Each structure stands twice: as C-alpha cells, then as structure tokens.
C-alpha cells in the first residue's frame, strides 16, 4: 500500500487528474489518497455532488478523508457505516471513504 496525503480540496478534485497526479498510473485500489480535512465532496447532499464523487471513484486508488470544518455533516451522516482496516468509515462510494472520528 502506498499512502499520499493532501488536504483542503473543497470539492475541487482537479489535482487528481492524471496530468496533475501522474503517479496514479501505477496505483491500485489498495493505495490510498488521504484528504486531511475540508474534503467538500459531499456538500449538497444530492445529485449535484455526483460528478466529483464519481470521478474519484473512477480513479485507480482509494480516496479516504477526514472531515474538516467545511463539510455538510448532516449529508455525511446519511451514508452507511462500515469497517475499514479496523476503524469505522462512511462509505460515500466504493472507493471514497470518510474516516469516522473517535
């Protein structure tokens, strides 16, 4: 597993395009990009979020994020909980996960 860390995407996932993040061509779903706060991909809590979330889910890696102060906590709480590497997550998409606190 490879781990890459970034933060403050605020719903703008252009940094994960292949031309910006060329290392992804050798990554798999076992590799993780961790967004450390202010993910912003679940902002509206409806279909307006789909394009960005579907883009991330289509990448060859898994995106995990920790919520920040700019999140829609009510919308995030509506996603199902699961266990991932011994911790609780919210499954936003099969390969887009919110790491639960606590």
Put a short name on every predicted segment.
Residues 1-4:
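Extreme N-terminal starter segment of soluble prokaryotic enzymes
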Residues 6, 12-102:
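Core catalytic region of metal-dependent phosphoesterases/phosphodiesterases
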């Amino acid at each position: 597993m490879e781990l890459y860390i970034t933060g403050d995407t605020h719903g703008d996932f252009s940094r994960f395009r292949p031309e910006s993040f060329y290392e992804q061509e050798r990554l798999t779903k076992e590799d993780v990009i961790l967004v450390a706060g202010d993910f912003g991909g679940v902002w509206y809590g409806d279909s307006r979020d789909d394009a960005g979330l579907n883009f991330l889910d289509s990448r060859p890696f898994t995106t995990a994020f920790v919520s920040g102060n700019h999140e829609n906590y009510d919308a995030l709480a509506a996603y199902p909980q699961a266990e991932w590497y011994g911790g609780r997550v919210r499954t936003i998409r099969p390969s887009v996960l919110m790491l639960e606190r606590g």
